[in-house]
Amino acid sequence: MDKENLISLEKILGFNFNNPSILLSAITHPSYAFEHPEEGIEHNERLEFLGDAVLELFISDYLFRTFPQKSEGDLTKLRSRLVCAESLYELAFKINLDKFLRLGKGEFKAGGNQRMSNLANAVEAVIGAVYFDCGIEAAFSFITRLYGEKLKPENLEQLPKDEKTTLQELLQKEKNNVLRYEILLEEGPPHQKIFTAGVIINDKLIATGRGKSKKEAEQEAAKKALELLKNEKEV
């Protein structure tokens, strides 16, 4: 990526990075880093890890202050809707990450710049980059602008639920259900891993799902579990 493109992204984000290579790393998919080791740019998984934590802190703090009467369970549900892959995927297009994401040739040809997991992960990586380079206040300011109208209390109540949240709420209607997710399998090279996740209810494996990230695999597994439970009720 040339310097002009990186400056264009900085303008969209509203920040001049002290170390532009941090931003470059945030938009570098593992497949690209694997194909171009000569650039010496780290891929975005570590920044994604950092950004995930920063985003969760911001959303938790915001919801805690905005809804003083809501229970821990209700706050958790709202947070899940705000930070789920579907929500981050939508936000990625707001800052044109689909145009800036650096992908390996195979991943790009496979439509990787439109793939939910790639874009959702890149959003978290960008948040991590802003935090690491500019500090917590800058990161919180960026998240506020990124989410925009989504953070208005009246809009928060209308947020769509992801599959994991829907499954959790369904099981909570019946007492004593214990829900957990487990990564059952990791396949492929480091830059193109495929994960298989399992939905386990009361220590019983109910459904599995596959995806290019752990989150994506868990969402797919939850979706299949919901379909299975729905079919059982219709019988």
From Swiss-Prot:
<keyword id="KW-0460">Magnesium</keyword>
<comment type="similarity">
    <text>Belongs to the ribonuclease III family.</text>
</comment>
<dbReference type="GO" id="GO:0010468">
    <property type="term" value="P:regulation of gene expression"/>
</dbReference>
<keyword id="KW-0479">Metal-binding</keyword>
<dbReference type="GO" id="GO:0046872">
    <property type="term" value="F:metal ion binding"/>
</dbReference>
<dbReference type="GO" id="GO:0003725">
    <property type="term" value="F:double-stranded RNA binding"/>
</dbReference>
<keyword id="KW-0507">mRNA processing</keyword>
<feature type="binding site">
    <location>
        <position position="124"/>
    </location>
    <ligand>
        <name>Mg(2+)</name>
    </ligand>
</feature>
<keyword id="KW-0699">rRNA-binding</keyword>
<keyword id="KW-0378">Hydrolase</keyword>
<comment type="function">
    <text>Digests double-stranded RNA. Involved in the processing of primary rRNA transcript to yield the immediate precursors to the large and small rRNAs (23S and 16S). Processes some mRNAs, and tRNAs when they are encoded in the rRNA operon. Processes pre-crRNA and tracrRNA of type II CRISPR loci if present in the organism.</text>
</comment>
<feature type="binding site">
    <location>
        <position position="48"/>
    </location>
    <ligand>
        <name>Mg(2+)</name>
    </ligand>
</feature>
<dbReference type="GO" id="GO:0019843">
    <property type="term" value="F:rRNA binding"/>
</dbReference>
<dbReference type="InterPro" id="IPR014720">
    <property type="entry name" value="dsRBD_dom"/>
</dbReference>
<keyword id="KW-0540">Nuclease</keyword>
<keyword id="KW-0698">rRNA processing</keyword>
<keyword id="KW-0963">Cytoplasm</keyword>
<feature type="active site">
    <location>
        <position position="52"/>
    </location>
</feature>
<keyword id="KW-0819">tRNA processing</keyword>
<dbReference type="GO" id="GO:0008033">
    <property type="term" value="P:tRNA processing"/>
</dbReference>
<feature type="domain" description="DRBM">
    <location>
        <begin position="162"/>
        <end position="231"/>
    </location>
</feature>
<feature type="active site">
    <location>
        <position position="124"/>
    </location>
</feature>
<dbReference type="InterPro" id="IPR000999">
    <property type="entry name" value="RNase_III_dom"/>
</dbReference>
<dbReference type="Pfam" id="PF00035">
    <property type="entry name" value="dsrm"/>
</dbReference>
<keyword id="KW-0255">Endonuclease</keyword>
<feature type="domain" description="RNase III">
    <location>
        <begin position="6"/>
        <end position="135"/>
    </location>
</feature>
<keyword id="KW-0694">RNA-binding</keyword>
<feature type="binding site">
    <location>
        <position position="121"/>
    </location>
    <ligand>
        <name>Mg(2+)</name>
    </ligand>
</feature>
<dbReference type="InterPro" id="IPR011907">
    <property type="entry name" value="RNase_III"/>
</dbReference>
<dbReference type="Pfam" id="PF14622">
    <property type="entry name" value="Ribonucleas_3_3"/>
</dbReference>
<dbReference type="GO" id="GO:0006364">
    <property type="term" value="P:rRNA processing"/>
</dbReference>
<protein>
    <recommendedName>
        <fullName>Ribonuclease 3</fullName>
        <ecNumber>3.1.26.3</ecNumber>
    </recommendedName>
</protein>
<dbReference type="GO" id="GO:0005737">
    <property type="term" value="C:cytoplasm"/>
</dbReference>
<dbReference type="InterPro" id="IPR036389">
    <property type="entry name" value="RNase_III_sf"/>
</dbReference>
<comment type="subunit">
    <text>Homodimer.</text>
</comment>
<dbReference type="GO" id="GO:0006397">
    <property type="term" value="P:mRNA processing"/>
</dbReference>
<dbReference type="GO" id="GO:0004525">
    <property type="term" value="F:ribonuclease III activity"/>
</dbReference>
